[in-house]
Amino acid sequence: DFANDRIIPDCVRAAASGKDIIVRNPHSTRPYQLVLEPLAVYLTIAMKQYEDRTFEGYYNVGPDDKDCVTTGTLADLFCAAWGQGQTWENRWMGGPHEANFLKLDCSKIKHTFGWTPRYGVKEAVEKTVEWSKEYLEGADMTEVMDRQIREFFIS
């Protein structure tokens, strides 16, 4: 995801250009997770639903409560993972109202499948920074993604 006004892509762009990260609302809480978390469990859900129709329905996939952090905390984790003295600043310039707290209720998937996230928010940010740096350095991204997928499934 390289879209504007997304915290991690904004962090990567700022860090890659040697600028401070601009955080619009450091006190808002969001359910941040590594993209591999929902993708992996969606495949499990699809397989289970294919095998047994009693599993049909919707499921929320999100981080554990302890990993629902503020945007400021996420920016801190990003800066620590990026290194090189990366910093962020709080700069709200108006704009549309944003909910201060967003969280997913993942109790159904946890109860039904015994699912728990493989990575906490710190590991998720570290893996995202690792991927981003390798992308910016022109690495073979197929190899990078294959390695990260293997690491994810053996964690």
Where are these regions (language model features)?
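Amphipathic terminal alpha-helices
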Residues: 121-155
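Residue-level signal for the nucleotide or nucleotide-sugar donor/cofactor binding architecture
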Residues: 2-6, 30-36, 66-69, 97, ...
